[in-house]
Amino acid sequence: MRKIQAKKGLSIECKGWEQEAVLRMLYNNLDPEVAERPEDLVVYGGIGKAARNWEAFEAIEKTLRELESDETMLVQSGKPVAVFKTHEEAPRVLISNSVLVPEWANWDHFNELDKKGLIMYGQMTAGSWIYIGSQGIVQGTYETFAELGNQHFNGDLAGTVTLTAGLGGMGGAQPLAITMNHGVAICVDVDETRVDKRIDTKYCDVKTADLDEALKLAEEAKERGEGLSIGLVGNAVDIHQAILEKGFKIDIITDQTSAHDPLNGYVPQGYSVEEAKVLREKDPKKYVELSQASMAKHVELMLEFQKRGAVAFDYGNNIRQVAFNNGVKNAFDFPGFVPAYIRPLFCEGKGPFRFAALSGDPKDIERADEEMRKLFPENEKLLRWLDLAEEKISYQGLPSRIAWLGYGERAKMGLALNRLVRDGEISAPIVIGRDHLDAGSVASPNRETESMKDGSDAVGDWAVLNALINTAAGGSWISFHHGGGVGMGYSLHAGMVVVADGSERAERRLERVLTTDPGMGVARHVDAGYDIAIQTAKEKGIHIPMIDKAGDK
């Protein structure tokens, strides 16, 4: 085991900045400021890892240092398996993580292979080396709660209390996103270290293990109409049940525990973190049974809050499916967050554009933010987000920024960043990527593609096509994964990263990749018959051969 830290500065140890970018982002994923359990190579999301084991990690390191600028390294579930001569505008790395043949695409088979050292769970950005800490999901979470406020609470969350659970790498964004919308958040986590991490990074305001204290703080903040986030240490099922018994009014209920992984991601009711760890190793089968039973109860409690007037939604961890499989037949009575709040953005090719400063200098991000304001002065949502981000976001590892941009905007910003690097206004190359949760890169029937207009929720072709077109367009590293967010058997998804190093070659690649990538999002939603997507494609001149038939669905 080694302690990995994000590498900063202007000197490089690889044969080019592109290879150096891959290495630095791999290191960044495992920086203690960023990763959940770096000693185990776990970045976030239960067992979402950056490399299969330490031996494979060191082989990846060595290969990247030796990789020529016209070669491509292939990575199979966190292990480097080949290097081939390609060309300078091909990706330097192609990654496939935890992809199983459908009949065997379940946790039992995955865990068998994992024990044999043959596979690795890459989550979404863990195994594709573009995780930037909780900031990576904060804006999406912020936009989700903002839209919820628009739909249900006259445009704002002031005077509301949200109850949720899970303060890991993804869920850790919730307290900050809710307070950014002026709401009160009670965020439950059984693991006190996770609450502490969110307090340390200022994503969460206060910590307590006393439910009565949490409710008192929440009520007082609600009456004042002020935002406040409370990290409450405890088991979600116990806490939810107690709040219902006390009759305390909850306005919004959701959940972001790692319920997608019943063995490694969720702690059953009645167990401490340490007790759960012992049982997990001693009797994994019993652990999963207890975990799934707790999830069923968890969803029943969420449904009861909904019955009492709370706005309920699933935050993409597949907890409804587990509950349904364990006897809760009305588990899907509350919607997922994508169809409820996010899909119109996807129809315009909008999604989680993100970039990181390889120099490690926060001034590079400040300059990039300034440029974004100049490029998109009419985008009020973006400007408001940048104000909030600059005020409230603490960097984890390499300085970075998330900014939801749409078709046309991403290419424009990417080219601007490349120009700033070329002209020395930004001191070192910038890495540009995104979450796999994006407009055209995921097939996930219980999350991103839930309730598609044409019923194409489970069609996986789109995620494959996204990876293929971004490879053809010349991304710096491209990934294809299975099971991220919602667990084995429930999702296929692709990621892309492209490096802005100031060169003409980078300019060509940036323009191509940052057009094809969001373009796939528009195309996917055109094909499903969404009017916003059809209008966007026509306005932007995206060539969709059968667009005139799309509206018939």
Swiss-Prot record:
Pathway: Amino-acid degradation; L-histidine degradation into L-glutamate; N-formimidoyl-L-glutamate from L-histidine: step 2/3
Record has Lyase as a keyword: yes
Gene Ontology biological process terms from the UniProt entry: L-histidine catabolic process to glutamate and formamide; L-histidine catabolic process to glutamate and formate
GO MF annotation, one: urocanate hydratase activity
Similarity comment: family membership: Belongs to the urocanase family.
NCBIfam families in UniProt: hutU, PRK05414.1
Protein name, as recorded: Urocanate hydratase
Subcellular location: Cytoplasm
Cofactor(s) recorded in Swiss-Prot or TrEMBL: NAD(+)
Record function comment: Catalyzes the conversion of urocanate to 4-imidazolone-5-propionate.
Residue numbers binding NAD(+): 45-46, 123, 169-171, 189, 194, 235-236, 256-260, 266-267, 315, 485
Catalytic activity: 4-imidazolone-5-propanoate = trans-urocanate + H2O
Pfam families: Urocanase (PF01175), Urocanase_C (PF17392), Urocanase_N (PF17391)
